[in-house]
Amino acid sequence: MNHQSLSAFIWSVADLLRGDYKQSDYGKIILPFTVLRRLDCVLESTKAAVLAEHEEKKKLGLNADPFLLRKAKQSFYNISPLDMKKLMGDQDHIKENLFSYIQGFSEAVRDIFERFEFYAQIDKLAKSGLLYQVTEKFVNVDLHPDKVSNSQMGLVFEELIRKFAEISNETAGEHFTPREVIRLMVNLLFIEDDQVLAKAGVVRTIYDPTAGTGGMLSVAGEYLEEHNPEARLTMFGQELNPESYAICKADMMIKGQDPANIKLGNSFTEDGLENDRFDYMLSNPPFGGAARL
């Protein structure tokens, strides 16, 4: 399934929301659920090992965090015995169990869902009698990395955000830069350093002050990996929109980047990385929107 087909399937959740939600609010449900399902699928293969490690370290009274990260093989984990499929086994307690499942994630992931204001949306879905149906819809979407690559997942997020921007009468340019444009920018950025970037073990940093969902950072990382699998590109970014920030942070975590490198806020007036220096920088400022300086 290509990213357009996958986006269309996820978008079909809107059929369940119609009547209870305004079109402009669909994104408040669909985006965080898409992130949740992706994280759920990423952790699936290491879930049992993480739970066993958590129990062992709890008995010993140790700080389990570094051990759990190692077992999860990611920069995040979940210590709840629940997962999205198990949520389907108890329709009467879907809200409480979903809250509990999200609380089982490590701190950086919980921050993502707080930025989405996801708990309020879960509560609203429960009151509307839609929570179980919506959750079930996402359980039927396989977003495992073996089926959907990080690159494809990034395109899915961008496509969903583009749809939401259209129905909200927002400017698409604030949310989306075509991938062919990004690839050209990345080629121009790296071309002078081709010989340096070809060296084994080379490490470089890159920064996007208007990161959006992280598309530019991701393409830069893909470029370097294609040209030198032994190179390491550490990514930094800042984003003003809380939903785009949350998606970017989730995407960076799944790629093995440090989620603390992604900051929320206006990079012109609230520079979250003012004391840092970077090897490269690229950006597409939101020219379609009014400047907020």
Descriptions of predicted regions:
Residues 1-194, 261-272:
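Non-catalytic, mostly N-terminal accessory regions of nucleic-acid modification and defense proteins
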Residues 293:
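A mobile, often basic/glycine-rich helix-loop segment
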Residues 172-283, 288-290:
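Conserved S-adenosyl-L-methionine
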